[in-house]
Amino acid sequence: MNGVDDKTEVREYFNATGFDRWRRIYGDGDVNKVQLDIRTGHQKTVDTLLGWLNDDGNLNQITVCDAGCGVGSLSIPLAQAGATVFASDISEKMVGEGKDRAQALGLMQNPTFAVQDLEDLSGKYHTVVCLDVLIHYPSDQAIDMIKHLASLAEHRLILSFAPKTFLLTILKRIGEFFPGPSKTTRAYQHRESDIAAVLESCGFKIQRSAMTSTRFYFSRMLEATRN
């Protein structure tokens, strides 16, 4: 299936059955063991990223584009820390949930939320972040997407993806990588060397990396800055 069909599938999923499932996973209510494991893994990735940005000590001076923001798990704490955040997602329902969560915390104007495809994002930002989104893109589409996101980043681009390793490929094939009850869209893995090569071709150098592994959640994260 081509990239357009994948995108349509993702949009429809996260605006229908997937919305309630992932809203609960990215919340703090009761969930099943698999969903709790995924929640824990995703939060570890978010916490690692927040730690990286906080270490720089300039969050209140930078703009951040959270591309594929979901329900605002990253956008909201970034705004609370002082960053000016533009948050977008392909799912109208996910964006609506993100707005509600932000406003419940008194964040009325920051983050700025928008329903938008990654391909349609424009503007310039100090930092562009794309967490756990490339899993929806096959390799050729992911390369094009990374190039596009790189064009928006004035200083830094941070990506996370499901790494393509022998072990994880085997796990995926036997149905343990993304269990049916928790994920029903296609799950694409990517080689870290391919991601790094694209970043370097766009004039970026990898500065930091991290790996989050739980039983059902695997995410490799790379931070790259312009040379």
Model-found features: residue ranges?
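Conserved S-adenosyl-L-methionine
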Residues: 68
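Short catalytic micro-motifs in class I SAM-dependent methyltransferases
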Residues: 132-133
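A short His-aromatic
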Residues: 136-137
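Short glycine-dipeptide loop
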Residues: 152-156
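A conserved beta-strand element that flanks and buttresses the S-adenosyl-L-methionine
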Residues: 129
